[in-house]
Amino acid sequence: MESLTKTEYVDAFLSNYSPNDSMSIFRQRLEQVRLDNDMLSQWIRERMDIERQYSDQLHKLAMNMQEKNNSSFAFNYAWKQLEGETLEISRYHSQIIGQIASQVYKPLIDYYTSSPQTATLRRLAERLSTVAEEMASSSVPGLKGLKKKGRDADTKSQNDLTASRATWDSDAPLAFEKLQIVDEERLLILKQVYLTIASLETDTALKQQEFFSKSMAVYSDLPIEGEIRQFMNSTSKVMSSASANKPSKSSGFHINNGKSKEEKSHGENESGGKLKNKMSTLFRRKTIMPKKDKKPSHKSNGRPNKLTAFFNKNSKASSISSAEEHPSNIDDSSIERRHYDSNHSSQIRDHPSTNNNASSYQNFNETSDEGEDNDATIRANNVRSSFLEAPLPVQPNVQAETVTPKISSKASPFNKPNSVHSEASRNTPSSIDRENASHSNPIMMHGNDFGGNFNNMQSRSTTTSPTSAVASPAPTENEDSNAAIERVANTLRKNPTISRRTRRAGTMDRYATASSDYMESNLGSLPNLSTLSLQSGPDSTATWHPEFPNSSGLSASIVEKYSGELSEDGLLHPSCSGHIFMKYTSDFNTPPPEMGVRVASEFPMSFTHLNDHAVKYGPSENTLSLIPELLLSPIKVTDFNLHLDSINGASCIPLTVVQKWKHDESSSSMIAFVKPNPVWRNLGSSLHIEKLVIIVYLGENVLVKSCQSSPAGEFSRKTSKLKLHLSNINISSSGFKILAKFAISPSAAIRKPVIEFRIRMVDSSNNPGLTKLFLKPDMFDTTSSSGGSQLESAYEETKVPTSYGIHVRECSVFADMS
């Protein structure tokens, strides 16, 4: 307001330095502002009446739905009707906000920040600053002496008022006081205009939130038993059809999980079944058991088989060095690996997307699960060291089987005869060639699935010392089952770090999955029915980089990260931190030596991690001094923290959720609707989100045995959490539906369901963020005086073109258990 009043003082002296003419012009413009305000208020009242009618219709719809029988009510019809009503309300909301911005804010800003005669204003600003200094240094108390002095000068120079500039300078303080008196009325009217607009906008936002809560309250009374029953029927059909089909050969390596019915009927007796149940109970949440192949091998000689080879694996460097020193230890499996290295080009042709998927998934895990990755890496290292110390035995009464991975390449190195192996052993490549091959072939290190990874582990285990293989001999067929269980229990007690799931060597992938066909399918096509492993979809989005607008000169990219607890009242305990990236694009001109930038925000701000190489703090608050020559490539300038309040927290999160839970003794079922937030700042017909991760869990101490969900996602028995990954999606105003069912062990733990959001999006609208950047040319302008530069900064600041990225981390939604 202070800058606007100073502008009015300047505008009053423009026309022939006559205060009377300027006052008449000012009164005319003020009447026009009053008229525009009345028209806008009438227009908003009409639209609020229309929205009130829509709210009444929604209330009638809710009452009718409560009166009808829930079992006979058509769920899809009600959802379509609600979608139409919500879309209509959001359209009116967008029109009201746009009309307020175009009819009120923009004319006021254009009027009060215009400078038609810049040179005259600069001269007048210097005079006014001189008068202000005289008023401050004068010993006469206040304006009383200046009034007297001005009246005496007015009586002496009545004939030539506009002829002498010195006379006008002596008259300036009196005119200044007159403007102050008249300006009080203008300030009151302006304050009334702004308060009216702000109250109307707040009422509109509250109405929208009330309409949304009313419309969603309709579905809080709907039973979900029918939906879950229909979901269970569809999932059982999908599983029956999936088990009848054979796995495709074009997906690389495959492992056939389980035996056929005939083998199970003939190969397992009663004691074997009991032993298998005991072993599965013993190994639960401790270690992983490799799946069995349908075709058993004929080379079962009772010796340590694939389990000992799997658990006695060494690192790649130790296998290479031992192979160099002891060439007699090289057997057929290591030769197979070398053939696999030499023929890796065919594998890369068949699987071109393997490297991209691995790298992109690694990048996303670094951004979304930073805390989990460090713990998991330590656990994986502990697992490898513990496996080398004490291998685990094999179940008795089960024949030793070997995994026969299927390879879709033309010349498979695993199907060559022994003569080829012996011939290749004579032509062993050097260690340098093997290192080059291993670095150039990421498939050899990571594998396309569990089969490829397991084969690499076998090849590494060939050079282990014979003492490690004899340390825990495999049980014979006649060994007692209780003795075998006791042996395994002792081994597990000695190695408490053995985990049920281990990460792949050298990758940040979540967990191994048995089929790559499912990974290439759509994320929402099949439900997740896995209880022992995780099904993860592809992560096609690479590491996110800041986007800059296409403009010459200085441009910026601001990434804002929000967190808090989402509730019906908005975002509780909100917090916002962000990064500011800048870039200077020169259009064949020499960039200036320094530039000033002001960071503006409605909330208190603090800078952290300032880049001292290219940026310094400015002379005033929230200002930065930049060196454009060092910003020719994008660089992160600084980090910042915003201190938010819960009043404006509702407009920070672009998504909201409505959920309903049903809890039984052994299960918990959920139905949730994820929709765009109607009070968010940039709500349109649809909302584009670059990456969305939804995490659902029942509480801290609730152990979940299995989970079924639609759409499909990842479920971890270790953390008892369900994760849904969605990339590059457009969410309409009606939103989408999530179904989930958790099977739990009956316990006394209290279930407190929580849904967490992690959102990443890039907003291309003009003014979406909480922080804005303005150029400040007066920071390095030494020609004008200090008073003039302060006055000019009110209307000479220009906004820096900026692209905004929005990240939401750890935004929790707690279920209402009442």
Swiss-Prot record:
GO cellular component, one term: cytoplasm
Residues covered by the F-BAR domain: 7-269
PROSITE patterns: F_BAR, MHD
GO annotation terms (biological process): actin cortical patch assembly; clathrin-dependent endocytosis; septin cytoskeleton organization
Pfam families listed in its UniProt record: FCH, muHD
Family: Belongs to the SYP1 family.
Region (Disordered): 142-163, 239-374, 403-441, 456-481
A single MF term (Gene Ontology): cargo adaptor activity
Domain (MHD) ranges: 551-807
Biased composition, class Basic and acidic residues, residue ranges: 259-273, 323-352
Disulfide bond entries: none
Name assigned to this protein: Cytoskeletal protein syp1
Role, per record: Multi-functional protein that contributes to the endocytic process, but also to events that occur at the neck during cytokinesis. Plays a role as an endocytic adapters with membrane-tubulation activity that associates with transmembrane cargo proteins and initiates the formation of endocytic sites. Contributes to the stabilization of the nascent clathrin-coated pit. Also plays a role in late endocytosis by mediating vesiculation. Involved in the regulation of cell cycle-dependent dynamics of the septin cytoskeleton by promoting septin turnover in different cell cycle stages.
Primary location group: cytoplasm
Keywords per UniProt: Cell cycle, Coiled coil, Cytoplasm, Cytoskeleton, Endocytosis, Phosphoprotein
Modified residues (Phosphothreonine): 463
Subunit structure: Interacts with dil1.
Keyword NAD: no
Biased composition (Low complexity): 240-251, 310-322, 459-476
UniProt subcellular location: Cytoplasm, Cytoskeleton
PANTHER family per the UniProt record, alphabetical: PROLINE-SERINE-THREONINE PHOSPHATASE INTERACTING PROTEIN 1, SUPPRESSOR OF YEAST PROFILIN DELETION
Composition skew (Basic residues), residue ranges: 283-301
Stretches with biased composition (Polar residues): 353-366, 403-431
